[in-house]
Amino acid sequence: MATATAAGCSGAVALKSLGGRRLCIPQQLSPVLAGFGSHAAKSFPILSTRSIATSGIRAQVATAEKVSAGAGQSVESPVVIVTGASRGIGKAIALSLGKAGCKVLVNYARSSKEAEEVSKEIEAFGGQALTFGGDVSKEEDVEAMIKTAVDAWGTVDILVNNAGITRDGLLMRMKKSQWQEVIDLNLTGVFLCTQAAAKIMMKKKKGRIINIASVVGLVGNAGQANYSAAKAGVIGFTKTVAREYASRNINVNAVAPGFISSDMTSKLGDDINKKILETIPLGRYGQPEEVAGLVEFLAINPASSYVTGQVFTIDGGMTM
């Protein structure tokens, strides 16, 4: 396992009012729970087994092994960059793609120990991974991150823009620094990473880009003007880039999670949990693995090759 450094947490959704209290649930704090993939199987029938979700890449890997033994040829596994991948949703995505046979660059901003653990888990499963510490809102860090992946594995096939932060506050009290920090990481970071990775994808006329947005980008939320604006921007950005890159066979989609199980939700009182769950038709929190299952489908499943410019909500029916 290799480690690179240069300088992530994906989003949050907040309930406007819960008995006079306001609650913000950071998605990136969502832990990868035991029984990996079990929840995804229940929620996404098309991904009801890991073999369906990853049949394309695993078939390639199996074929490569046979051909290599007989004729010295091989089929390369896809190279993936996941930003903000040290914990929560990003961690679940990195593990899912790593275990599916991809080579994964695990990006982090501060949580180096957690990122190393993600890489080790991928390697323990037989995959390849490296970590890179860098701030995706800084152009020089993004360029270094892309170079690290290319130097190690020769290319970038898939980009998952997951890194993000929240700096909540009512608009009248929000400081410009709170606004700018969220916009810089959650929106400008997506722009910088996409632009850098797309240069590589365009040359070979193939690639997949998945942006992690939020239901807040669709419906807004009091106290999160900065975050809502950034995620709405990610959604508009996704659709525009999908149009620009479609002729180069680059698929660009967004995933918009709702309330996702996290360390914070596990510590909530029964009354608060009850009020939150009343807003979710399915009556439960989502799991990081469910988001990862959807991302995996969009990233490597051949059945998603005709899907681009779409926003997939995964919120238990909260915004339908």
UniProtKB/Swiss-Prot annotation:
Residues of the active site: 227 (proton acceptor)
Domain of life: Eukaryota
Binding site for NADP(+): 82-106
UniProt-recorded name of the protein: 3-oxoacyl-[acyl-carrier-protein] reductase, chloroplastic
A Pfam family this chain is assigned to: adh_short_C2
Subunit structure of this chain's protein: Homotetramer.
Signal peptide, first to last residue: none
The keyword Transport is assigned to this record: no
Class of the enzyme per the UniProt entry, highest EC level: oxidoreductase
Phylogenetic classification of the source organism: Eukaryota, Viridiplantae, Streptophyta, Embryophyta, Tracheophyta
GO biological process: fatty acid biosynthetic process
Catalytic activity entry: a (3R)-hydroxyacyl-[ACP] + NADP(+) = a 3-oxoacyl-[ACP] + NADPH + H(+)
Subcellular location: Plastid, Chloroplast; Plastid
Keywords per UniProt: Chloroplast, Fatty acid biosynthesis, Fatty acid metabolism, Lipid biosynthesis, Lipid metabolism, NADP, Oxidoreductase, Plastid, Transit peptide
Transit peptide region: 1-61
GO CC, alphabetical: chloroplast
Designated gene of the protein: CLKR27
First-listed, main subcellular location of the protein, grouped into a coarse class: plastid
Enzyme Commission number(s) from the entry: 1.1.1.100
